[in-house]
């Protein structure tokens, strides 16, 4: 009898095509807008998107792409593109046929792009030739796995030469007959292939499965419904996290699952254009690294626009208190989130619990500035070097370790790094944090960025947070610099606000920090030994301040 029952049972697989299927069934007429700089506004419904996805999926199958299996990559499709409607097509079409979507980081140096593509070995390369055609020949010369190039353009361009491989215009994919049924795929099949940003060495690759990404989509869509974000289908969303960066934090999937009535993709990152589109489309919900929020607030056109309806989640780096208050002065709602490339990425969001909702504004800000509390289906601890939980006192620093369904199983071709990350059944993030009695955490630093002075730790993020509140400070980074006596000492590198260039002094900053010493918030020995003023700070390919460059640049700053 049990055999008969089993024969009728359908083992439902959590695959990304199911997210699209639900969105189309529940919200067929919701709108996706693609509005690139200098281009015209293009609008499609969720139903129209599904038709595009099915046509592209069928066309890709005709290129003889092979599906993966449980924990085993199939054919890889590399994409080099900005935040466009075409990229959204591919976020669904490529994984839904069992292939792996490899999101090439557009901000890497050409050598790093070639390196990651050499490791990934994609069979099909889909590329925006308006911006990236100069990379085509060096990539094809070095990455011999590529047998077809699909080229995209907003300007009607065609490739400028014969590249020796099959060249297909993206529009030809859309002319294909739509795929009637997506193939059955094991939910453990890798859906995406990502690389870390490589701030401590060459970028490292790993994959995320359909199951992990579907559960991540459900969890994040649920978590953002909490106050103060209160995300709902009435929110018009803009995808500002680059789509080449950790799935754009899952927004191409979660915003559709969440039924947002309008989802806007602004193309390449032109901040004057983006501000205008936020205004004209009535955007109320977005997210990005602190640099993105900083650009929205400081662009010369920014004062022309009302940002008071915009709810914004900051992740990828710590939210400085000064940036939070600058955004609040414009009426914005801003909170923190946290995650990694290896974690798909979201692990925590600093939402408010019921007991927080009547707190004074300053107390709420303390919560928004924390890294947050784990979202559904994430288990999180903060541990010492012996993997023991640190006290939940908001003071003791340890490392964040996690479990969830959406983690890298391994780093491709790097068993040593895999062993270092997975220990005792927990994924070690490399992030130092404190743990509060209520379960919220706050990142103190990357373990590699903690300043080790005289055998004690100085968290650079805490100093940056305090310095950022000075009225003359635009951006700040604090790094550890070699010191003959103490091992390392902190040095602050500051970009002054307009009007403060040449006026702001080292003593101004040190005296400003003394007030926090006198209040007992930091010890005196944390005050930086040196303050350096610059016009700009170096950024990584994902828009974070590049402390590796700063440590190297200022390694002799305290030499006698």
Describe each model-derived feature in a short phrase.
Residues 28-31, 167-168, 175-195, 202, ...:
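Conserved pre-ATP/AMP-binding loop-to-beta segment of ANL
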Residues 108, 114-115, 125-127, 286, ...:
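AMP-binding/adenylate-forming catalytic core of the ANL superfamily
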Residues 43-47, 191-218:
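Conserved AMP-binding A3 loop
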Residues 214-236, 244-284, 299:
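Conserved AMP-binding/adenylation subdomain of ANL enzymes
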Residues 40-43, 59-111, 239-240, 457, ...:
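Conserved AMP-binding/adenylate-forming
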Residues 152, 518-544:
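AMP-binding/adenylate-forming catalytic domain of the ANL superfamily
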Residues 168-171, 257, 280-288, 297-366, ...:
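Gly/Ser/Thr-rich phosphate-binding loop
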Residues 96-172, 498-500:
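Structural core segment of the AMP-binding/adenylate-forming
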